[in-house]
């Protein structure tokens, strides 16, 4: 069964978003379902710190032994940090997609930046 933490928000593109409760900053990663479908992740291309991203835009890609998949911005804002550990160990996405395998953090300007995201129950229904 797919792990879907209740405290996170989700996108239909199988990304999760965590409110870090500091300066309107959110941490972003891919879901357990996504990493399972991708198979062994071998390379991750992330956005650059300082990039301005728009929700729904392609901001990078994830390459696995099965395919190459686009990485989408779940919210609009500025990239504050990226997970540099993924350059040397992209398999963290498979091992710990909600912890060590996070992708990037983004600072949003709008208070309702996450209004379009799914809660855990809605994401589970999407998968069913």
From Swiss-Prot:
Domain Lipoyl-binding, first and last residues per copy: 25-107
UniProt keyword Transmembrane present: no
Pfam families: GCV_H
The keyword Transport is assigned to this record: no
GO cellular component terms, semicolon-separated: cytosol; glycine cleavage complex
Any Gene Ontology biological process: glycine decarboxylation via glycine cleavage system
Top-rank taxon, per record: Bacteria
Keywords on record: Lipoyl
Cofactor remark from the record: Binds 1 lipoyl cofactor covalently.
Cofactor (UniProt): (R)-lipoate
SUPFAM superfamilies xrefs: Single hybrid motif
Chain positions found as N6-lipoyllysine: 66
InterPro entries: 2-oxoA_DH_lipoyl-BS (IPR003016), Biotin_lipoyl (IPR000089), GCV_H (IPR002930), GCV_H/Fam206 (IPR033753), GCV_H_sub (IPR017453), Single_hybrid_motif (IPR011053)
Function field: The glycine cleavage system catalyzes the degradation of glycine. The H protein shuttles the methylamine group of glycine from the P protein to the T protein.
Entries under PANTHER family matching the protein: GLYCINE CLEAVAGE SYSTEM H PROTEIN, GLYCINE CLEAVAGE SYSTEM H PROTEIN-RELATED
NCBIfam families: gcvH (TIGR00527), PRK01202.1 (NF002270)
Stated family: Belongs to the GcvH family.
Record's subunit section: The glycine cleavage system is composed of four proteins: P, T, L and H.
Name of the protein: Glycine cleavage system H protein
């Amino acid at each position: 069964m797919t792990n879907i933490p209740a405290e996170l928000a989700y996108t239909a593109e199988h990304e999760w978003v965590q409110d870090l409760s500091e300066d309107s900053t959110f941490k972003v990663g891919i879901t357990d379902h996504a990493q399972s479908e991708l198979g062994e992740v071998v390379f991750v291309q992330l956005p650059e710190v300082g990039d301005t991203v728009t929700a729904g835009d392609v901001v990078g890609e994830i390459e696995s032994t099965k395919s190459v998949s686009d990485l989408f911005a779940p919210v609009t804002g500025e990239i504050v940090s990226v997970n540099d550990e993924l350059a040397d160990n992209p398999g963290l996405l498979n091992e710990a997609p909600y912890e060590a395998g996070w992708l990037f953090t983004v600072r949003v300007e709008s208070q309702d930046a996450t209004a379009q995201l799914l809660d855990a129950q809605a994401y589970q229904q999407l998968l069913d």
